[in-house]
């Protein structure tokens, strides 16, 4: 037998030993210490307690009276919580939920059970949301939990406009309030929001907080306030407070000219699962700012995740769900010519994008695995609808709903029909799901589906967008009746893209003006609402040609599409045809700007003096 074989660890023996200790505990065999909490006795083994708890290790090894006692009374400890920790000590299983985790953390902190503390920290960080972030910030500060504190603070900054009215915000300590109000990362579009939050906190308990008037108001960047707000605010103050306020505002002057992070937000087109410009990877995630005409790199979804569903909520939170990941231990080549060499596994992953950190944060997974599910946000909940899956037709009908406050998924009424592909939008708190020439409407309050008017054309893989009380169904592949043959949308030569409009008030479809496109192009149309206008992002060239992208804008009154913007090929490379496209507000300073690229062809490839560059004809200068 080799030396390596002799040193192998028998994990089965370790598990068996733990199981035997558990049986000794349950049968009260060989116990040598009794913990007493609130009149409840817990016979235990000193060795087990000392192994998991620094508190008990110090107690039993100190040589003091407690080390010789057979009964120890514990103060300020809950009996039910102690039972959870003891069970963990003997089994490694930790039972916790939203109602017990904070008490469990407090007890584990007192008993110095580091493993339990770490598990509780991870649980709480995962559960942070707009409803509890302020309270968890105070909780983390109380127990000096820096990791939890920073995560909670980032959520407070991100959701500031939603949380500063909460009672938990009114009860923040002075130091925590200053830490928040002084932050450059507050997601506010106006400094008036910060001023209002500061005044609400001060007025919550005027008598005890008047001493903090100057220090609190010094965090307000007065130069960012409108002149009307400055004048009205100062004139409305009591005479005794005016000098204090003036001193406080004077202290804030060095920060006058630095905007909050939320003031730098730009509305961007977000491309998930676009073809990568890096030949060593298949996909990339980028965003394009139409105002700045710049492309920024987003953190790609974890574990090479692709074929996901995407959604941006009204609160500007970005989520992705479902998709596929490469199987582990398979020969994987990430080059673009080796897609078929990799085996994939369908997953139920669900991620939230932390825009400050430019990273994807895992949330509770969906109940079903899904490929390219339709994701929408309706009445504060996120719905995952259909999608392709390994469960066949039955699974394609399933619909589940995510509660952002509870971080949990529940099933709702299934789709009336099963489809491999569908598009979904939300209008007037109702969800409209479309495929081929069919459309169904889901009413969340009654949890029911109703079939709506059929479209005039049968198309799949189209792009849909809601604009006001209208739904636009754009592009896609025509399905020939009874044949299943798919033809490009629009005219025979592909020189336009078909558009249909649905009026939710009249329950009727009508044809709209087609979108112009170059002959034989491959549009890859994506409908979006940007700058309060309905637009389409599309490719003007065939996939075999150099990629050239444009955006068109629709005029509802004139029923006309007009060119909004040409996008330089030096800015945006070939995105492929399977990318997801949505619109959200992001912070340029938190993103990595994509480097400038020279034109694909610096000179004409055929030697002529005139050639096309970025959509324009360019002539070589005379020699």
Swiss-Prot record:
PROSITE patterns for the chain: BTB
Top-level taxon of the source organism: Eukaryota
Domain BTB: 31-98
InterPro entries: BACK, BTB-kelch_protein, BTB/POZ_dom, BTB_POZ_KBTBD2, KBTBD2_BACK, Kelch-typ_b-propeller, Kelch_1, SKP1/BTB/POZ_sf
UniProt modified residues of type Phosphoserine: 300
SUPFAM superfamilies to which the protein is assigned, alphabetical: Kelch motif, POZ domain
Transmembrane segments: none
Domain notes for this protein: Recognizes the BCR (BTB-CUL3-RBX1) E3 ubiquitin ligase complex substrate, PIK3R1, through the 4 tandem C-terminal Kelch domains.
Record protein name field: Kelch repeat and BTB domain-containing protein 2
Organism: Pongo abelii (Sumatran orangutan)
């Amino acid at each position: 037998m080799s030396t390596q074989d002799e040193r192998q660890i028998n994990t089965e023996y370790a598990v068996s030993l733990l199981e035997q200790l558990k049986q000794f505990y349950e049968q009260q065999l060989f116990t040598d210490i009794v913990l007493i909490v609130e009149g409840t006795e817990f016979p235990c083994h000193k060795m087990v307690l000392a192994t998991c708890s620094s508190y008990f290790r110090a107690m039993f090894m100190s040589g003091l009276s407690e080390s010789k006692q057979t009964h120890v009374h514990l103060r300020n400890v809950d009996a039910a919580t102690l039972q959870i920790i003891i069970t963990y000590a003997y089994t490694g299983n930790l039972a916790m939920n939203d109602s017990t985790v904070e008490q469990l953390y407090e007890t584990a902190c007192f008993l110095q059970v580091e493993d339990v503390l770490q598990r509780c920290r991870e649980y709480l960080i995962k559960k942070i949301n707009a409803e509890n972030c302020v309270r968890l910030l105070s909780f983390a500060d109380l127990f000096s939990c820096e990791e939890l504190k920073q995560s909670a603070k980032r959520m407070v900054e991100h959701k500031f406009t939603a949380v500063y009215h909460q009672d938990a915000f009114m009860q923040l300590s002075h130091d925590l309030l200053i830490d928040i109000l002084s932050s450059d990362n507050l997601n506010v579009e106006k400094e008036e929001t910060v001023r209002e939050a500061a005044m609400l906190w001060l007025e919550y308990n005027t008598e005890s907080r008047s001493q903090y008037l100057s220090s609190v108001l010094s965090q307000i960047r007065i130069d960012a306030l409108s002149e009307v707000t400055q004048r009205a605010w100062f004139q409305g103050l009591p005479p005794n407070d005016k000098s204090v306020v003036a001193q406080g505002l004077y202290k804030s002057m060095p920060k006058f000219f630095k905007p909050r992070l939320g003031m730098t937000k730009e509305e961007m087109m977000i491309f998930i699962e676009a073809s990568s410009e890096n030949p060593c990877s298949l996909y990339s995630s980028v965003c394009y700012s139409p105002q700045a005409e710049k492309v920024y790199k987003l953190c790609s979804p974890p574990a090479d995740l692709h074929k996901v569903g995407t959604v941006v909520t009204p609160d500007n939170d970005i989520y992705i769900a479902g998709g596929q990941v490469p199987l582990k231990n398979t020969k994987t080549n990430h080059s673009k010519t080796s897609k078929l060499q990799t085996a994939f596994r369908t997953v139920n992953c669900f991620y939230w994008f932390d825009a400050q950190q430019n990273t994807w944060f895992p949330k509770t997974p969906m109940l079903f695995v899904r490929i390219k599910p339709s994701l929408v946000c309706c009445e504060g909940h996120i719905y995952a609808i259909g999608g392709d899956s390994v469960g066949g037709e039955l699974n394609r009908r399933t619909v589940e709903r995510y509660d952002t406050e509870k971080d949990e998924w529940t099933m709702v009424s299934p789709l009336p029909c099963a489809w491999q592909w569908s598009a979904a939008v939300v209008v007037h708190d109702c969800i409209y799901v479309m495929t081929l020439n069919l459309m169904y409407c889901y009413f969340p309050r009654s949890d029911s589906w109703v079939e709506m008017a059929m479209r005039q054309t049968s198309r799949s893989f189209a792009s849909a967008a809601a604009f006001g009380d209208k739904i636009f169904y754009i592009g896609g592949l025509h399905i020939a009746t009874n044949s299943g043959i798919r033809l490009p949308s629009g005219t025979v030569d592909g020189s336009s893209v078909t558009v249909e409009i649905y009026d939710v008030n009249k329950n009727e479809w009508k044809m709209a003006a087609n979108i112009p496109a170059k002959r034989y192009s491959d549009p890859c149309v994506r409908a979006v609402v940007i700058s309060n206008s309905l637009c389409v992002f599309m490719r003007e060239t065939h996939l075999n040609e150099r990629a050239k992208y444009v955006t068109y804008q629709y005029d509802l009154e004139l029923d006309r599409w007009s060119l909004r913007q040409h996008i330089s090929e030096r800015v945006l490379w070939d995105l492929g045809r399977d990318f997801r496209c949505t619109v959200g507000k992001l912070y340029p300073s938190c993103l990595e700007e994509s480097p400038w690229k020279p034109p694909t062809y610096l000179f004409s490839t055929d030697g002529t003096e005139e050639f096309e560059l970025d959509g324009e004809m360019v002539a070589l200068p005379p020699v």
